[in-house]
Amino acid sequence: TVYAPWKDGYINDKKGHPDPNNNSIVGKLVFGKFSELFTGDASRDEENRLIKEENTKLSSRVLKVGHHGSGSSSQTDFLRSVRPEIGVISEALHNDYGHPNPQTMKRLAAEHITVYQTATQGRITIHTDGKTWNVTTEK
């Protein structure tokens, strides 16, 4: 299921310009009892709109943490709507942006979400038969 971008147009930044990050493709993969929510570079504004318009549909076992774990993504209300068991952060080691943001990591920990990071664990693979699932990492 694709939840965003929105049919009625872009979410704009504070200057009224379309914000590419807040217009990321957001989709949910469901296979049997397994589900994963992919959030692209979605930030706070897009997360808030998802909560408002799709709240009951967001719950997923796995969350691809938005915007590489930036401070503008994975707000507490959004995490509580998704209720993931694990979060996957795709980021480079020692990247120029400081991803993942320490506050984002604290929010994930506060919600008891197990975090996997490509920077430290390499390729992250999730295997499922639709009933059970497990995670393997390269490192």
Task: Give the location of each predicted region.
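Core dinuclear metal-dependent hydrolase active-site scaffold
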Residues: 1-62, 120-139
